[in-house]
Amino acid sequence: MNAFDNADVMIPKTVVLCTDIFDEFMDTNELYQIALSDIPDEEILRAFLQARLPERLIGDLEAYLDVVRQPIAIRSSSLLEDAHYQPFAGIYSTYMIPYVESRDVRLKMLRDAIKGVYASVFYRDSKAYMTATSNVIDQEKMAVILQEVAGNRYGDRFYPNISGVARSVNYYPIGDEQAEDGTVNLALGLGKNIVDGGMNLRVCPAHPDKVLQTSEMEIALRETQTRFYALEMKAVEEDFRVDDGFNLLKLPVKEAEQDGSLQFIASTYDPYDMVIRDGIYDGGRKLVTFCGVLQQGVFPLSLI
C-alpha cells in the first residue's frame, strides 16, 4: 500500500449485509405478495419503506455510522449480478446518502436506502429482465454493500476529483496499445457519469501520454467531459424515490472550476491563439484532460 512516495492508497470503510438479512426482512414483513404483484414501482417502494429491518441489525448500523464521516453508497450485490453469462450488473439500485451531523437522521436515511435496494429487485424493469433471462425472481437473493464515498465537500455538494472504471482487457487497442494493457475510463465527479455512458476520458495505463481524445484540438473540444455528477449534501430522510439518482446533481464543468477542484486535471483552451494549454488559466474554456495526472506525474494513477 505504500509503494508510491506521493500517494496513499486507502480502502473505503465497507460493510456487507449478507443475504440472510434480506430473507429475514422479506419473511418477517410478509412482503412477497406485494413484491411479486404488478403494482407500480412507487407502491412497492412505499411498502418496503414502511417495513422494518431486523432489530439485530440496527446496532451494527449505528456502530458503522460512528466511524464513517463521509457520505455512504448503498450498493446492491445480488446472487445474479455476477452471473457469467447473464449478469445483472446495473439492474438494481445504488443509493448515496450525505453526511449530516445528526446520527439519527443518517440512520433513518441508511435504513431507507437499504430498503430501497431491496425493493429494486421487484421493480418492473428488474422483473422484465429476469423473465428475459429465464431466471426466477423469487429465487433471487440480495446482499447490500455499505461503502464510504471518496471525495471532497464543496459547499452543499460532494464529489471526487477523479473517478474511474478499469477494465483488464483492451478490446480496441490503438497504435502501440496491447489488449492485455487494459483500459481505464476517467471522469471528474461521481462515477455515474461513466456507468451511464456519459462523456469521459479513455486511457491505456501503459501509454498515459497518448490519449486519442486529446490528440487534436478539434477532438478535445468535442470529445471531453462537459458535465459531472455530485451528491447533494442535504438530508433526504423523507424523500426516497424509485430513481436512485434523485439526490445527485448534474453540473457543468464550470461549477467545478468555481469550486477549485480542477487543479491538475484540466487544461485551458485559448480561443485567441487557438491552442490548448495544460493547467488552469484565466479566461478560456476548461477541458477535463487529466493532464497533470497522466502526463506530468502529479499523481501516479497509471502505475497504480
Model features per residue range: what roles?
Residues 1-3, 52-304:
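Conserved mixed alpha/beta core segments that line enzyme active sites in large multi-domain catalysts
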Residues 1-55, 290-298:
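A conserved helix-loop-beta module that forms one wall/lid of the active-site cleft
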